[in-house]
Amino acid sequence: MTTYFNYPSKELQDELREIAQKIVAPGKGILAADESGPTMGKRLQDIGVENTEDNRRAYRQLLFSTDPKLAENISGVILFHETLYQKADDGTPFAEILKKKGIILGIKVDKGVVPLFGSEDEVTTQGLDDLAARCAQYKKDGCDFAKWRCVLKIGKNTPSYQSILENANVLARYASICQSQRIVPIVEPEVLPDGDHDLDRAQKVTETVLAAVYKALSDHHVYLEGTLLKPNMVTAGQSAKKNTPEEIALATVQALRRTVPAAVTGVTFLSGGQSEEEATVNLSAINNVPLIRPWALTFSYGRALQASVLRAWAGKKENIAAGQNELLKRAKANGDAAQGKYVAGSAGAGSGSLFVANHAY
């Protein structure tokens, strides 16, 4: 086993590290707007709007043309391939609109999950084959970071060793390819909230998964300062008794401290089907845990930033301003939470669960 390898050049290290640091600047986080066509269809169906390309474009136009002060709390937006190349009504590309606001462009690069044969309903994520070429093109088209999601399930016998190892290795290979093309990889190993497991089991599984992920990243010589982690918060299963925000926060920070190297620039939590209010309250609690936290701890939320926006808009032109106002409110609430300053209930957020069983993007 050789221990000789090359780190990226100093120029590449600097570029990757600076992008990662900008994304997790104090009080800022990520808007995940990378829902695929079918997933966006479900969101639109909930408000009685047909899933057409133009309706998807109209909704994303609402998000991206929100007042420039959105950039006070949103540092980056994750786009779906279709969205990166769409334009506003006046012909301005969405990418340009976001860049003018000083918002960094990200892109979802995985191609969804496929079954692991012989496992108990476990999956791995596909999309590595042409990833280098796609990343090179996305960088040319203005993207500076990428996202790749792997999914693990907690059951009596899962996640299995096979699934933990395979998904860790896929994430490491993805991260390595991204960095070779000057793109910061967001590493997302999501332990799903489905099930009736308790907080202790969720914490142990999360620790085991993260330990495997960082071993794989080390094996692939990934430059950690030029990466971000997008994990689940540690919560009991969806059908188990709920814990307090303080209990969730402590379990989450303990799991991260035990497994995530201090070199990692930041952690941008996924909301994982929590209600808007829960996702914000829990993030604020995480930033108040009385333990040393060497990384920025912020958000990369989809549903927890958009549910109120969709409801306010309801597909109607005359409601665009109302929808944008909701987005500003949610972004500000989560920006405060990323600094441990959110006051529960102060943003009038929805408290309805946004959980989707066996969630696929």
Curated annotation (Swiss-Prot):
GO terms for biological process: canonical glycolysis; fructose 1,6-bisphosphate metabolic process; fructose catabolic process; gluconeogenesis; glucose homeostasis; glyceraldehyde-3-phosphate metabolic process; glycolytic process; mesoderm development. Optimum pH is 7.2-7.8 for isozyme alpha, and 7.2-7.5 for isozymes beta and gamma. Pathway: Carbohydrate degradation; glycolysis; D-glyceraldehyde 3-phosphate and glycerone phosphate from D-glucose: step 4/4. It catalyses: beta-D-fructose 1,6-bisphosphate = D-glyceraldehyde 3-phosphate + dihydroxyacetone phosphate. One of its GO terms (molecular function) is fructose-1-phosphate aldolase activity. Signal peptide: none annotated. The record marks Y361 as: Necessary for preference for fructose 1,6-bisphosphate over fructose 1-phosphate. Enzyme of the glycolytic pathway. Glycolysis is essential in glial cells but not in neurons; neurons rely on the citric acid cycle for their energy needs, and on lactate and alanine secreted into the hemolymph by glial cells to fuel it. May take part in developmental stage-specific or tissue -specific sugar-phosphate metabolisms. Protein acts on two substrates fructose 1,6-bisphosphate and fructose 1-phosphate (like other class I aldolases). Belongs to the class I fructose-bisphosphate aldolase family. Homotetramer. This is Fructose-bisphosphate aldolase.
